[in-house]
């Protein structure tokens, strides 16, 4: 199979690691080779969490600059920060609901303008799918399901060798039963949002 490289970036607490775990489980269920690595940074203090997932036969978990087939950003500024991993053929999916860093909140930093941020990403990549995933997570009944909204958008692109059914089966294994219904609804809302983007 053709190798596919995925980068997921988020701020600590947004559920990046659960999303990666669901994708890993889905790959395992359908016997797709997968190498995965994570960088936690200062995750517990709102720092960056980055996951690299490489689907296909490869020996490395490193995705070098310009190698990502797809970038999923749970937070807009983090998406912009990871843009160096992209190339002219990369598809970028980003949440447009910002989580303001401490420095911005105390007036010692400036958050990027969302319109300019999208223009920069659009210029460097093949396709940008950008929407407010936090709004869709609330609509699904769980404000913490932004990760599942973005997972739905990712699977809709058809870039990864995973189907909706495979990912939903993995969600049933990896997510808490109390949140399963809202997570499945969040996934479907993200899928629909990417479809109409």
Q: What are these regions, as identified by a protein language model?
A:
Residues 1-197:
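Active-site cofactor/cluster-binding pocket
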């Amino acid at each position: 199979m053709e190798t596919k490289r995925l980068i997921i970036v988020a701020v600590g607490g947004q559920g990046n690691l659960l999303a990666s775990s669901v994708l890993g489980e889905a790959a395992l269920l359908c016997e797709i080779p997968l190498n995965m690595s994570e960088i936690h940074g200062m995750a517990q203090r709102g720092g960056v969490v980055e996951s690299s997932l490489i689907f296909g036969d490869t020996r490395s978990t490193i995705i070098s600059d310009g190698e990502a087939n797809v970038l999923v950003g749970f937070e807009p500024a983090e998406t912009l920060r990871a843009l160096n991993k992209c190339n002219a053929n990369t598809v970028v999916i980003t949440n447009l609901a910002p989580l303001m860093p401490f420095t911005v909140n105390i007036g010692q930093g400036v958050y990027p303008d969302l319109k300019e941020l999208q223009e920069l990403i659009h210029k460097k990549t093949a396709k940008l799918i950008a929407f407010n995933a936090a709004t869709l997570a609330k609509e699904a009944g769980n404000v913490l399901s932004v990760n599942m909204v973005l997972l739905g958008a990712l699977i809709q692109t058809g870039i990864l060798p995973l189907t909706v059914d495979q990912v939903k089966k993995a969600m049933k294994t990896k997510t808490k039963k109390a949140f399963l219904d809202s997570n499945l609804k969040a996934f479907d809302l993200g899928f629909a949002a990417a479809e109409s983007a």
